[in-house]
């Protein structure tokens, strides 16, 4: 008798995706982050659902409803901090996942990569709107500053901002719609992640060598299910340690002050995972130029496959490209640090240099270095 998991219409989809999936025998722990992102998304949707049961999206009661969740709801504090720090873990996994894709040339799977870039935008939009919901000082002013950037768009800018606000300032209408979008977007992200997987399974996974692995495949279960469980346990360990020992480590103290439109915080800054993009935005004195640079800082990822000039897919055997890759990582860490600093000397010039280097590395230096390495192969 044929196994039910291979014949049942629903079970065979799960079987071909997570059980009998042929996977390369040599994929390292860098390939764990896809499953970790899935776990993060599930954690965020579940904790978010329970938070939404107690949250009120009204400017008068939003802040106190979050306080009520933390003080009066059974384990409300745990759910709230799991959700807030779960977002940080989500972004750590995202950045490592994208970094893996850049290093090993996974971007050559065009459809999978482009849906991944779309997913990155969707997750960033969701996180931004989620940060507005507690209605603290940084929530309010973050929303004001970031939505105001759209006014830089020629001709339609100011109308567009008022349309998003639902009035002439960030107010009740803005909070209500942000809550609605913040609730629906994770489900759109889950659907996109399904499409992301669908396209990935059309081609099969890449591997560290970047070579075709069709001759050497192993079943996903039990080999990679066990390997993924180790990653999940480590993720849970880090997340619970963060939540139980230092829940406010990555947050902003200003967000424990209720939103006040008449009092601007001395330093308006987003959550840590947006600081690199915020630094790029601030490094350009022109408003429209800054907005374009902000969007391009993520959108540049979509261009990477077309700038692949190397004869080898992975960076595993390309030491010069490896050097540039790690310079890029250091540059992004520098931008993250600069994004959290005040706009004054020497941070302004450091941010500008780091922003120039970021685009220069991806668009110019890496493709040229790849061509140079191609010539080295002839020696």
UniProtKB/Swiss-Prot annotation:
The chain crosses the membrane at residues 33-53, 77-98, 113-133, 178-198, 226-246, 288-308, 320-340, 347-367. One of its GO terms (cellular component) is respiratory chain complex III. Pfam families: Cytochrom_B_C, Cytochrome_B. Component of the ubiquinol-cytochrome c reductase complex (complex III or cytochrome b-c1 complex) that is part of the mitochondrial respiratory chain. The b-c1 complex mediates electron transfer from ubiquinol to cytochrome c. Contributes to the generation of a proton gradient across the mitochondrial membrane that is then used for ATP synthesis. It is found in: Mitochondrion inner membrane. Binds 2 heme b groups non-covalently. Heme 1 (or BL or b562) is low-potential and absorbs at about 562 nm, and heme 2 (or BH or b566) is high-potential and absorbs at about 566 nm. CDD domains: cytochrome_b_C, Cytochrome_b_N. The cytochrome bc1 complex contains 11 subunits: 3 respiratory subunits (MT-CYB, CYC1 and UQCRFS1), 2 core proteins (UQCRC1 and UQCRC2) and 6 low-molecular weight proteins (UQCRH/QCR6, UQCRB/QCR7, UQCRQ/QCR8, UQCR10/QCR9, UQCR11/QCR10 and a cleavage product of UQCRFS1). This cytochrome bc1 complex then forms a dimer. Keywords: Electron transport, Heme, Iron, Membrane, Metal-binding, Mitochondrion, Mitochondrion inner membrane, Respiratory chain, Transmembrane, Transmembrane helix, Transport, Ubiquinone. This is Cytochrome b. The gene is MT-CYB. The keyword Mitochondrion applies. Belongs to the cytochrome b family. A ubiquinone binds at residue 201. Heme b b566 binds at residues 97, 196. GO terms for molecular function: metal ion binding; ubiquinol-cytochrome-c reductase activity.
């Amino acid at each position: 008798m044929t196994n039910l998991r291979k014949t049942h219409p629903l079970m065979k989809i799960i079987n071909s995706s997570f059980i009998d999936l042929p996977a390369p025998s040599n994929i390292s722990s860098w390939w764990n982050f896809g499953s970790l992102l899935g776990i993060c998304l599930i954690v965020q949707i579940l904790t978010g659902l329970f938070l939404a049961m107690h949250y009120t999206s009204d400017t008068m009661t939003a802040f106190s409803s979050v306080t009520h969740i933390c003080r009066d709801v059974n384990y409300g504090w745990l759910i709230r901090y799991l959700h807030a720090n779960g977002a940080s873990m989500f972004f750590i996994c995202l950045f490592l996942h994208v970094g893996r894709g850049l290093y090993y040339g996974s971007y050559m799977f065009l459809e999978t990569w482009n849906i991944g870039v779309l997913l990155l935008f969707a997750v960033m939009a969701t996180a931004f709107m989620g940060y507005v919901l507690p209605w603290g000082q940084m929530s309010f002013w973050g929303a004001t500053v970031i939505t105001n950037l759209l006014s830089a768009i020629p001709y339609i800018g100011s109308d567009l901002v008022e349309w998003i606000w639902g009035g002439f300032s960030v107010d009740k209408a803005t909070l209500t719609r942000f809550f609605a979008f913040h609730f629906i977007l994770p489900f759109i992200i889950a659907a996109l992640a399904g499409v992301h997987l669908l396209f990935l399974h059309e081609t099969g996974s890449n591997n560290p060598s970047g070579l075709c692995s069709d001759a050497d495949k192993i079943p996903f279960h039990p080999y990679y299910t066990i390997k993924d469980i180790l990653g999940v346990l480590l993720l849970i360990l880090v997340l619970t340690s963060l939540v139980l020992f230092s829940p406010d480590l990555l947050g902003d103290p200003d967000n424990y002050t209720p939103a006040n439109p008449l009092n601007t915080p001395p330093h308006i800054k987003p959550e840590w995972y947006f600081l690199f993009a915020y630094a790029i935005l601030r490094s350009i004195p022109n408003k429209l130029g800054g907005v374009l640079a902000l969007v391009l800082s993520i959108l540049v990822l979509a261009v990477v496959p077309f700038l692949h000039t190397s004869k080898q897919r992975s960076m595993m055997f390309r030491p010069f490209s490896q050097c540039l890759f790690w310079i890029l990582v250091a540059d992004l860490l520098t931008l993250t640090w600069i994004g959290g600093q005040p706009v004054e000397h020497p941070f302004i010039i450091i941010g500008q240099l780091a922003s120039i280097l970021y685009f220069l590395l991806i668009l110019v230096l890496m493709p040229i270095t790849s061509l140079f390495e191609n010539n080295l192969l002839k020696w």
